[in-house]
């Protein structure tokens, strides 16, 4: 059975009626408990996670609204004003989601998170600059630069040597022609290098703005948790218990 319910996750492409990349599939068989299958995608269509877990109708434990896993190994937080099944989230999952969606607030209740953004290093952009066309352009320009630079240097050196020889033989016309050819060659090479470098600098600047490491400034739940978070966790447990189908 395939349900048409849509998971309103931050930054998701929420079109469950036509998109198979974000759906819930419940298989009721006699071989085992029903399973929950969820695929989470970001704004640019990249698959962030695929989650398969067994459903337990008697369970009243909250789970992360992004990865749909419980508090196994990592505590669940309630960093915003969302309640019910959308109120709990892992800190690492939320950081990954905010980094992928390039936002700093909850897109459901619009609560602004206290985050610290750090730009990613240049090596990550060189490994994965983005779309396939940009990656192909970067590779081609780097290969051309590696091969054209020594060719331009050798060609210019040969032209200048030829111009010197023609000057010794009093062939000024040929010498002027070789010097003009050298100047034109280096002008074209410098212009191509500057245009290519400026183009890739713009791509890197845009990539750096939209691909940052996001760190939440939220203290995870521990023994010294404040009463506000305790009340949120208690209300979340009650809300999930009420919404759990029997």
Curated annotation (Swiss-Prot):
Catalytic activity reported: S-ubiquitinyl-[E2 ubiquitin-conjugating enzyme]-L-cysteine + [acceptor protein]-L-lysine = [E2 ubiquitin-conjugating enzyme]-L-cysteine + N(6)-ubiquitinyl-[acceptor protein]-L-lysine
GO process annotations (BP): antibacterial innate immune response; antiviral innate immune response; endocytosis; positive regulation of lysosomal protein catabolic process; protein ubiquitination; suppression of viral release by host
Effect of gene knockout: Knockout mice are phenotypically normal. Increase in cytokine production following viral and bacterial challenge, including increases in Ifnb1, Il6, Il12, Ccl5, Cxcl10 and Tnf protein abundance. Increase in survival following exposure to a lethal dose of L.monocytogenes and decrease in bacterial load in the spleen and liver. Increase in susceptibility to endotoxin shock.
Upregulation: Induced in macrophages by viral or bacterial infection.
GO-annotated cellular components: cytoplasm; cytoplasmic vesicle; cytosol; endoplasmic reticulum; endoplasmic reticulum membrane; endosome membrane; Golgi membrane; lysosomal membrane
Gene3D superfamilies membership: Zinc/RING finger domain, C3HC4 (zinc finger)
Region Required for interaction with IKBKG, residue ranges: 121-246
Recorded superkingdom: Eukaryota
Entry keyword annotation includes Iron: no
Membrane protein topology class: Multi-pass membrane protein
Pathway connected to this protein: Protein modification; protein ubiquitination
Binding-site residues for Zn(2+) 2, renumbered to this chain: 80, 82, 106, 109
Entry function: E3 ubiquitin-protein ligase that may mediate ubiquitination of TFRC and CD86, and promote their subsequent endocytosis and sorting to lysosomes via multivesicular bodies. E3 ubiquitin ligases accept ubiquitin from an E2 ubiquitin-conjugating enzyme in the form of a thioester and then directly transfer the ubiquitin to targeted substrates. Together with GOPC/CAL mediates the ubiquitination and lysosomal degradation of CFTR. Ubiquitinates and therefore mediates the degradation of DLG1.
Assembly: Interacts with STX6; the interaction promotes MARCHF2-mediated ubiquitination and degradation of CFTR. Interacts with MARCHF3. Interacts with GOPC/CAL; the interaction leads to CFTR ubiquitination and degradation. Interacts with CFTR; the interaction leads to CFTR ubiqtuitination and degradation. Interacts (via PDZ domain) with DLG1 (via PDZ domains); the interaction leads to DLG1 ubiqtuitination and degradation. Interacts with ERGIC3. Interacts with ADRB2.
Domain notes: The RING-CH-type zinc finger domain is required for E3 ligase activity.
Protein name per UniProt: E3 ubiquitin-protein ligase MARCHF2
Lineage: Eukaryota, Metazoa, Chordata, Craniata, Vertebrata
